[in-house]
Every structure is written in C-alpha cells, then in structure tokens.
Amino acid sequence: MQRELTIPSNDAFREIATKTEEEEMLAGLMAAQKHLPCKFFYDEAGSKLFEQITRLEEYYPSRTEKSILKRHAGELMRGAEGASLVEIGSGDCSKISILLQALPEVILKTSIYVPVDVSLSAIEESRCKLEERFGAIEVCGIVADFIQQIHLVSQYENKIFCFFGSTIGNLDRRDAVRFVEKLGKLMNTGERLLLGLDMVKDKAVLEGAYNDEKGVTARFNKNILNVANKILGTNFESEYFRHHAFFDEEKQRIEMHLMATRDITIKFPFFEGGLEIPKGQTIHTENSHKFTSHHIDEFASASGLSVRAVYTDSNRWFTLVDYIK
C-alpha cells in the first residue's frame, strides 16, 4: 500500500513520497546480499536511539564535530543575513543550534531554517525546541528522502546547505559524488555548503565507535527489523540477530550488518512461503564511508564549488569543509 502523504495543518512541514517503502524493503531482502536502506533506521524509536548514540563516549563524531562548530560558529555565520539554512538529514537540532546561537536576533528574524529529514517526529521536535529557544527564526521542515528529493529546496534563496554528521558517508562513493554534483547545480553564486566528514583513522577507534559497551548501537541496528515488521507485516524477531560492525580497510568504510544466530523463516502476509535466512547470513543495514583530503577535492571538482575553509580538531579525526559557489 502506498504511504499517504501527511501535510500538517500548520503548513510548517511537507511530506513527499517516492516509490513505496514496501518496494524498497522487498528489493533489499530478496537480493543475494540482503540489505535494508539505512533511512529506515529513523522511525521515532530509532531517532531517539541515535540521539543516545551521539552522547556515547565511544562515538566521537558528534562531539568532535560540535566542538569544531562551537569554535568557528562566528566565522561560519559571518554574512548570513537573510540566509536559508538548509540542514540535510537534520535529525535533532543540536548542531544547527550552535550556528543559530552565533546570530544576533536581528539577523535571526531575516533567516529561515529548513530541516530536511525522513523522520517527521524528529522535525517536529526540533521545531518546538528551536521556537522555544530562538523564537525569531522561521522553521519550514520538509519530510522527504533527501537523496531523491533535494530539489524541493530549490525555491529558497541565499542557501547555506548544512550536511553534518558525515551522513554523506552512508552513500556509496559514486552516489556521494553524484549528490554533491546535484547540490552544486541547485546552488546560486555565493551560496555555501558546510560538509562534515569523518576521516580515515585507526581501525580500533573506528570500530569502537560502532560497537559501544552499552549496546545502544546494537539496539539501534536491530530496530530496523521492527520498522520492517510495521511496513511489511513480517515476523522478524530481533533477538535472533546479532549486531555486527567492522571496518573494511580496502573500501575505507564501516559496515553494519545483522547476522542471523539461527536458521530463520520470515513470513510475509501477501505471498505464500517465506524468506529463508540461514544461520550466519547477514542483512547489510548501513555503510559509513570515511574520508581523506582527496575526497574534499573530489567533491569540489564534482560540484563546481570552491573550498572556502577547512576546519578540523587536534586529532584530525573529523573535518568540516566550507564550500562556496
């Protein structure tokens, strides 16, 4: 069944559907290497679990990127009068709040914040928090798959795209280049892209960030099976899957999988039989590619943007690149 579009009466949000969620999930589960699109992590429960992940000691990307933003917020927001701050894959509002705090109220009144995310609940929560803290700024959220539907923001002027959290690393290398190329075509002269990149580093540090001792990342990973059950009407039982995350050094990426701990038959309500998942087989749920200086230049070349500034931390673990058209 096609998901209905939801347009709340306050007109602060827009939700746009592409192909059905069922089609996307089924295609992944029927593939030779079973997989589920990582955007399905972020139902209400998944969004809350990810917020917990960002506060974990092992998960350095969030706190490192925030420290960079805090240190350079004034520079980043210089000349932001009348800006449309478009946050791609916005999640919670903790990072954009750092930038908004650097703006005086008179400039906030001329600005628009446009969070783009697949999670309506995350956007609603962010909107409430931002209105309470920064009442002067207008918030206009778009609930959409930003990979397919980023063109929806083309109407906004004086755009500053904020693509934080190294979320671009969830895309395959070619798709990441294509996406920044698409952004470049949406941008007018003088508009900017703030891109957060998690850099290649020691394998132990990388794997530790995705295998926390408290098991929050494991719960987050397994929650995608609950989402599949809601969408497909299947009978996935998360206790029969083990969280498995590792760094592939050749591909320079973390891979997250769910590994079956026993032979499993998954039932579907709309056709007979079932999907056999033997013990040891995995469902690939996410890639998180890591980056080098080469990729910073590659993105600039593909998008037609120039590197305005590059910010990093003392360990050079995380980089924030300020691109301009």
Can you describe what each PLM-predicted range is?
Residues 116-121:
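Conserved SAM/SAH-binding beta-strand->alpha-helix loop
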Residues 1-40, 47:
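N-terminal auxiliary segments of SAM/dcSAM-dependent transferases
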Residues 185-200:
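Conserved beta-strand signature within the Rossmann-like core of class I S-adenosyl-L-methionine
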Residues 82-91:
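Conserved class I S-adenosyl-L-methionine
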Residues 170-182:
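A short, conserved alpha-helix within the catalytic core of class I
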Residues 92-108:
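Conserved SAM-binding loop of SAM-dependent methyltransferases across substrates and taxa
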Residues 207-289, 297-303:
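Substrate-binding/catalytic lobe of Class I Rossmann-like enzymes that use SAM or dcSAM, i.e.
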Residues 33-80:
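Class I SAM-dependent methyltransferase Rossmann-like catalytic core
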